[in-house]
Amino acid sequence: MKSFVKPERDSLLRTVRIVFTDPDATDDSSSSSDEWLPKPRKVKRFVHEITFLPQVSESSQDRSNAVKTPRRKSTRQFKYPVGVRPRPSGKFAAEILNPFTKTKKWLGTYETPAEAEKAYVDKKVEYDALASSGSAVSSSVVTVTSQCLRSPTSASVSCVSADDLSKEKTSLNKDVAASGDSTTKEVFTTFDFSDVKIPDLRFLAAEEDSMVSNANGAELDFDCFLTDSNILLDDYSLLENDINFSRFENSLPSELPDCDFTEMEFQLDDFKFAYTDHLTTPPLGLV
């Protein structure tokens, strides 16, 4: 059995059938003898076919070649130089981190980013120079001190040079602190101390003088501790009147009974302690 394969064109064709009826049709093939039988009303039916090609769909290539709407490019934020940031007024501020005080130092506001960057670079060079000179002074002080310890003959010369270097380092540290705290220095220099009211403390000196004069004129009286006969606590006798010690009449000791501790045992919980195992000599009678 052969399989019928439709051509490619026929497979692409679309057919539309239009069917309708004509109620006024008059065609009749019956004879006159059949007139006595009831017959249904004949209706003429019409069928029309319309064939057409389907609409060609867009291919993927056509879609790729179509005009694409341009995508909106993301606007990247402009990167300003280090130490420069924009101000709401449209100008640019410059600031730098002080390596000695670990705080930010304000350098000012400028019209362009280039001016602000230049101020930052100049201040950074200044800080780098101060840091390098400070490290050089520290290393030289360490070497001079070690040489001073090793060679005692040249101790005076080395120590003098070490003192000079330490003074130089102290002055350098003062300069660094002054440069780092310029704002604080300006506040103290502009402050007027003449308006400060100093309290009058002269009344303290007057009270101190009066206390000293009273102490010099006072005399200590120790007579109140003595009786009329100038004997302190003459009427008090500890042994004769107040305390009575029994069994010591006529300053003689009393007789004590003889005690034998060899048969005595001390019992503490589950342990017994007998003195018979430890005493090798018989006890002596106590007189």
UniProtKB/Swiss-Prot annotation:
Predominant localisation class: nucleus
Location in or out of the cell: Nucleus
Entry-linked PROSITE patterns: AP2_ERF (PS51032)
InterPro entries for this protein: AP2/ERF-transcript_factor, AP2/ERF_dom, AP2/ERF_dom_sf, AP2/ERF_ERF_subfamily, DNA-bd_dom_sf
GO cellular component: nucleus
Family, similarity comment: Belongs to the AP2/ERF transcription factor family. ERF subfamily.
Record PANTHER family: ETHYLENE-RESPONSIVE TRANSCRIPTION FACTOR ERF116, SHN SHINE , DNA BINDING / TRANSCRIPTION FACTOR
Protein name: Ethylene-responsive transcription factor ERF116
Gene behind this protein: ERF116
